[in-house]
Amino acid sequence: VIVDAYLKGIGDFDAKKALEACVATANIDSYRGIGLYKKYGYVPYNVTDQYNSENWSLSKTLEYAYDDYCIARMAEKLGDKEVADEFYKRSRNYRNVYNPVSSFMQPRDDKGEFIRNFSPDDYTPHICESNGWQYFWSVQQDIDGLIVLTGGKERFAQKLDSMFTYNPSADDELPIFSTGMIGQYAHGNEPSHHVIYLFNAVDQPWKTQKYAARVMRELYQNTPAGLCGNEDCGQMSAWYVFSAMGFYPVDPVGGKYEIGTPLYPEMKMHLPGGKTFTVLAPAVSKENCYIQSVKLNGKNYDKSYITHEQIMDGSVFEFEMGDKPGQAWYSPR
């Protein structure tokens, strides 16, 4: 939150002091396994103490790596190369829990051995309120690196397809936080929220559009119980607002928003300085959820994302919509 605010110019605060606080917090060895994370490059699942009692070793490793990336981004912007280099290196620690044999992120012990009898659809103490399917994608800082680690775009796309089609069996006892399920995707629990938008990274944007439209229309209702899961700091609603406008921040501090599918024919965001950001999709409907082409300020647009600067400049994005999947309008990534 601090880094996102700083990079977007929100708030009046001492950025250098804020960075110092972030770095200090990320180096509190006695706090929730951070010392173990720094020592091994991951939090081992078999080491617990008074500061690391709840386990969640895999979740901590992946989330600490993203936090490190955020610190690196802020340090880089402030010109602190030493801190930026250190934390960019730490942000790659996600690789330390990837098991090429299972092709999943997997808990490891303090000897470096991956946990035995691992099943990605099991809910265990090593992953916070999720399973191995849902946390595999928690590398928002380096999706391209995750694709390479997995074996390339084709294999990554196959894994994404499986995420949305591998349904729990009738015998599976799902925990209370696994709601809004599409295959192993759990929209009622926030760790999954960016996964729909990853199809853009493998040049299959029509799947992002299909699933985003489905979630918006089926899993959000204008009723007292209209959300399919815990709101958790407003994230369920934030996902909907972003997605309804046709984009979503896979990497919240990256400055880019992956294009999905707009929900309404016209949406406007009134900005400081009298500017207005506009999204137009005159033909959009339940059936016409597929993007055929995109224009930015009247000119053909060939990116899978929009930028924060384009929003704040008061740009006009226009989407040509259709009822059949269109090919990627953007240059392959």
Indicate residue ranges for each PLM-predicted region.
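Short, solvent-exposed S/T- and G/P-enriched segments that are highly enriched in secreted/extracellular
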Residues: 302-307
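Active-site core of glycosidic bond-cleaving carbohydrate-active enzymes
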Residues: 7-278, 283, 309, 316
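Generic "edge-of-domain/loop-turn" microfeature
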Residues: 274-276, 286, 301, 324-326
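C-terminal beta-strand-rich structural cap/linker in extracellular carbohydrate-active enzymes
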Residues: 308-333
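Beta-strand-rich binding/interaction modules
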Residues: 287-293
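Active-site-adjacent, His/Asp/Glu-enriched structural segments that form or flank metal-binding
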Residues: 1-7
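Surface loops and adjacent helix of pleckstrin homology
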Residues: 282, 299, 322
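Short strand-turn-strand beta-turns centered on an Asx-Gly dipeptide
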Residues: 272, 296-299
